[in-house]
Amino acid sequence: MENRLINPVERVDDSVDNNIRPSTLAEYIGQPVVREQMEVFIEAARRRNEALDHTLIFGPPGLGKTTLANIIAREMGGNLRSTSGPVLERAGDLAAMLTNLEEGDVLFIDEIHRLSPVIEEILYPAMEDFQLDIMIGEGPAARSIKLDLPPFTLVAATTRAGLLTSPLRDRFGIVQRLEFYNIEDLTTIVSRSARLMNVVMTPEGAVEVARRSRGTPRIANRLLRRVRDYAQVKSNGEVTGEIADSALDMLAVDRRGLDHLDRRYIEMVHARFDNGPAGVEAIAAAMAEDRGTLEDVIEPYLIQQGYVLRTARGRVLTQMAIDQL
């Protein structure tokens, strides 16, 4: 799974994308509703000289949650302190981060759904009252003291918003869902990335990469790097529509953005479960994958594109998926 080219989960080689990420809302492409709302919220907070309300960003991986957190920090003029749910194992880890924040800073917690209940309890007063409750001592002599924190903004990201507890979710004043990108916006993103990477690319080449990127900018930039390699070796370095088509065919990413794992999922439900309904645990066992991989990585795009229906009785293939077979 880790080496799957169109896996939207971040890989080590995706770190080069940091150089081409937009740094302001004006440069941010796509997500028009989110962009317009954040422009208003950020400008209003700046005019009042206040910290932005705590913000929760959720959606499938690879759509720009971390990028948006960076943009929020830059637009608000504060420093960005980043961590993730699995990293914050002890109460002291979070307390250290909170006490090092300065007024107007942005604390970004990725995968916030993986926070432990103990860490969540510390976050509640920090988010609500900008206070940190610390226990000093042990046993009968233990006492609690409150530390005042400077006004800050917590920006949290998750691919599993449904796993957040209600008390935590209710403390976010702003909640934004990122949607899959359309081909037009992805084409603009690919063209911009190509320009920043000094890749000569025709409009047709950008469209070909965009249409196979599964609505995900991270995948689009990853495919662009591989298509660039192909163009340099097999041609004169220019990425045309024909070159992009040949490169992506070689990489086994078809024109619908499906790869061998997607096709295997569809074929498995068709052959083993008679087109469904089939339980996700049964499909995962048949494919030798875990349930989380199916729900977070494979199914979102298949459902969004209309290949699979998620029903109370299980997963069902649509006629579109059957026709592909």
Curated annotation (Swiss-Prot):
Residues 1-181 are annotated as: Large ATPase domain (RuvB-L). Residues 255-325 are annotated as: Head domain (RuvB-H). Signal peptide: none annotated. It is found in: Cytoplasm. Residues 182-252 are annotated as: Small ATPAse domain (RuvB-S). Mg(2+) binds at residue 66. Pfam families: AAA_lid_4, RuvB_C, RuvB_N. GO terms for biological process: DNA recombination; DNA repair. It catalyses: ATP + H2O = ADP + phosphate + H(+). GO terms for molecular function: ATP binding; ATP hydrolysis activity; four-way junction DNA binding; four-way junction helicase activity. GO terms for cellular component: cytoplasm; Holliday junction resolvase complex. It comes from the Bacteria. DNA binds at residues 291, 310, 315. The RuvA-RuvB-RuvC complex processes Holliday junction (HJ) DNA during genetic recombination and DNA repair, while the RuvA-RuvB complex plays an important role in the rescue of blocked DNA replication forks via replication fork reversal (RFR). RuvA specifically binds to HJ cruciform DNA, conferring on it an open structure. The RuvB hexamer acts as an ATP-dependent pump, pulling dsDNA into and through the RuvAB complex. RuvB forms 2 homohexamers on either side of HJ DNA bound by 1 or 2 RuvA tetramers; 4 subunits per hexamer contact DNA at a time. Has 3 domains, the large (RuvB-L) and small ATPase (RuvB-S) domains and the C-terminal head (RuvB-H) domain. The head domain binds DNA, while the ATPase domains jointly bind ATP, ADP or are empty depending on the state of the subunit in the translocation cycle. During a single DNA translocation step the structure of each domain remains the same, but their relative positions change. Belongs to the RuvB family. Homohexamer. Forms an RuvA(8)-RuvB(12)-Holliday junction (HJ) complex. HJ DNA is sandwiched between 2 RuvA tetramers; dsDNA enters through RuvA and exits via RuvB. An RuvB hexamer assembles on each DNA strand where it exits the tetramer. Each RuvB hexamer is contacted by two RuvA subunits (via domain III) on 2 adjacent RuvB subunits; this complex drives branch migration. In the full resolvosome a probable DNA-RuvA(4)-RuvB(12)-RuvC(2) complex forms which resolves the HJ. This is Holliday junction branch migration complex subunit RuvB. It comes from Psychrobacter sp. (strain PRwf-1). The lineage of its organism: Bacteria, Pseudomonadati, Pseudomonadota, Gammaproteobacteria, Moraxellales.
